[in-house]
Amino acid sequence: MILAILILYILSVVGIGIYCRKKTSTVNDFVLGGRSVGPWFTAFAYGTSYFSAVIFVGYAGKFGWNFGLASTWIGIGNAILGSLLPWLILGRRTRVMSKHLESATMPEFFGRRFNSKAMKIISAIIVFVFLIPYTASVYNGLSRLFGMAFNIDYSFCVVGMAVITAVYVIVGGYKATALNDFVQGIIMLVGIVAVIAATLASKGGFSEAVNQLSHISTEGTASPELNGGFVSFFGPDPINLLGVIILTSLGTWGLPQMVHKFYTIKD
């Protein structure tokens, strides 16, 4: 049953790429989706680019364990500072200016905005160099999660995901990416709800889960003497918590894969 679902998912992803190929006839269509991507697809594309492997591996595993219930502040910060404000402040401005300058990428935007070929080249090098470890971390997290869930070899997961992604992106361009992000975003939302429900059910409900969490020792944290630190308002390590909120919320304002979503919106 699990194998059948997995195969169906892979076929669906590739099928979306083939379907979108018919609507991709120019470079503008391939890179920007013809600047015609609607609000729902754009929102899910932004969200799945923002919260990829980190939502299940980083937030749930690392931050959840380090900060307890206070890690909820990270989600709130990401939603307001990392998602809402960029759209309000950068969204329209970036869309209008990138259209006016006829730029399809961030390096191209900088080059034409400041009439500087050097800035275009330098920004392209920066994007290329620093997106390599970023992309590697995403594939690493997803492959480990996938491997544990389906008992598949890690190396096979990495190669398989890279090949599948390459196929639908190369074949269908950005429209295929946006449509796949929409589908995968729905799957992620369902998965998050299912994980939370299963966790609370296994602990006897929300109140009992919080009660059990309050008895976990904070030894090894910044406040080892704080009783019930994992259920406190700011957690056992508020300074590092604030740092994580700022880093994960404001850092997205300049990520090329996030800003690129503004280039593609229809209106």
Feature locations, PLM:
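Membrane-interface helix-loop-helix modules in multi-pass membrane proteins
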Residues: 31-102, 235-251, 258-260, 264-267
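Helix-loop-helix module between adjacent transmembrane segments
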Residues: 74-169, 243-251, 260
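Small-residue-rich segments of transmembrane alpha-helices in multi-pass membrane proteins
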Residues: 39-46, 111-116, 184-198
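Hydrophobic alpha-helical segments and their helix-loop junctions in multi-pass secondary transporters
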Residues: 16, 20-23, 131, 135-139, ...
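Alpha-helical transmembrane segments and their helix-start/interface "positive-inside/aromatic belt" motifs
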Residues: 31-35, 178-191
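Hydrophobic, small-residue-rich membrane helices and short re-entrant helix-turn-helix hairpins
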Residues: 27, 102-114, 173-183, 254-267
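Transmembrane helix-loop boundary segments of multi-pass membrane transporters
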Residues: 2, 61-77, 139-155, 175-184
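Membrane-interface "cap" regions at the ends of multi-pass membrane proteins
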Residues: 1-58, 169-172, 194
